[in-house]
Amino acid sequence: MQKFPPLSLYVHIPWCVQKCPYCDFNSHAQKGTIPEQEYVQHLIADLEADLEKYQASIQHRSLHSMFIGGGTPSLFSAESIKLLLAEIQRRIPFSENIEITMEANPGTVEAERFKGYVDAGVTRISMGIQSFNDDKLQRLGRIHNAEEATSAVSLAKVSGLKSFNLDLMHGLPNQTLEEALDDLRQAIELAPPHLSWYQLTIEPNTMFAYRPPTLPDDDELWDIFEQGHQLLTEAGYQQYETSAYAKPGFQCQHNLNYWRFGDYLAIGCGAHGKLTFPDGDILRFSKTKHPKGYLRGEYL
């Protein structure tokens, strides 16, 4: 009998306030009101179609983890997220200690919703801080400032979350070694259980690709990584993926499932999935990228 790997679920919410110049994810700048209730209904219909189509792979399995990414999922209300999670659980069982991560902006409006997301069932928030330098944040097209980022972390700590992550970038336009390390020191000072510390890369078809900024050279990048890695290690963080650092016991289970070649369902615009079948065959699939098509019920 085929032994199945753990099963996860990725949920994609594609809207954001504005497209960042480095972003190559499937995200769409918000224009008017986001149809969040309608989109949630389509997410559930998408899941139902997959559960029926891939029954041979999915039946008798429970969800090990879930990741709600974007875009900016925290543009959705806590009520919508609660409905989404409840409807998913009605259709596929959750494991006893399921990890449910949701990406969020550290802007004031989104951060105030953290407690509501926890009440909805979210166990882990991943915040896109990127930098604590206001000039660098502006250059990256981020809509929050350093003060809002720090405030959001304080709110996360008292929201009832089991864990939270801070996304931080280095190798930013015109960034010096000391600026990069200062960002990292400020992040460490806030004592998140998990830090994702990754280098800015220029991806095709982004604004930065069309108008490339001046970035640190390879020698400077190596110095940033070497000294930054030492800071993180000395602060008790363990590197367990290329850009992921965690305090012991706080590794992201969803990302580990990707790294360990686990299975994952995928719903939402542009979401990618991978499933193992009883005969050992492996299927990879992706969903319709644009919200217009997806909201017409064209999921594949």
Question: What positions do the PLM features span?
Answer:
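C-terminal scaffold of the Radical SAM
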Residues: 4-6, 27-56, 61-300
